[in-house]
């Protein structure tokens, strides 16, 4: 993980008290807005000015939701389902989540890192065990948990076909969702199909390819917008959100709508 990404993680923790304070103020001032919380990794996380043009899909999701559905993006660079728990980040979400809210959980990129015991989980055992803690925590507070399979990386074989990169993790999540009776957003399958349709060259315009970096994991604004659109469509398809709660599913969303705030000191 680069220095920039470590700084982003620190900034996210620093912002937590402000986020909780703002939530408390909003609740005291009037009717409670329904909130969709995101627990995830760098592919979904808020990015700051020093990381631009890298963009998490969570930054683009509000463009596809009506204003009465707020987005609280708690995703943080470099986290797995395990390390997010161990650092107390789920506890922060559970301190503010409530009835009618949604907890969207998407992990696997860093769960796959077998060389790092602080992050690694095994798909059919510890990965599922960790995910259950998110499901149980949301349910205990009257919120709705939702699982999203991990968005695919940009990887093609010699024949130009997009290939999956997440091993058994998507299958393990699908099985858990079925066993637990929770909605599943199959972003892994949908993003793989999207990269296949776009092809080797055009997908470069969706990922964080710059003059100095060829990043096949993280997105630029068009890529984040495309993935957020997939997420919003799945939220509608699975009836997690109602038709009145989504918008622009088939409309162009300009990349210029993405902005990067300065990182918190």
Model regions: which residues?
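Short, basic, glycine/proline-bearing loop/turn elements
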Residues: 74-78, 119-120
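Secreted/periplasmic serine-hydrolase-like ester/acetyl group-modifying domain
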Residues: 250-253
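Short histidine/acidic/glycine/proline-rich micro-motifs that form metal-
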Residues: 44-45, 78-80, 152-153
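Structural motif
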Residues: 80-88
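N-terminal export signals
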Residues: 2, 7-28
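Serine-esterase "nucleophile elbow" of acetyl-processing enzymes
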Residues: 20, 27-75, 90-99
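Alpha-helical cap/lid subdomain in secreted, periplasmic
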Residues: 89-221, 225, 229-248, 259-263
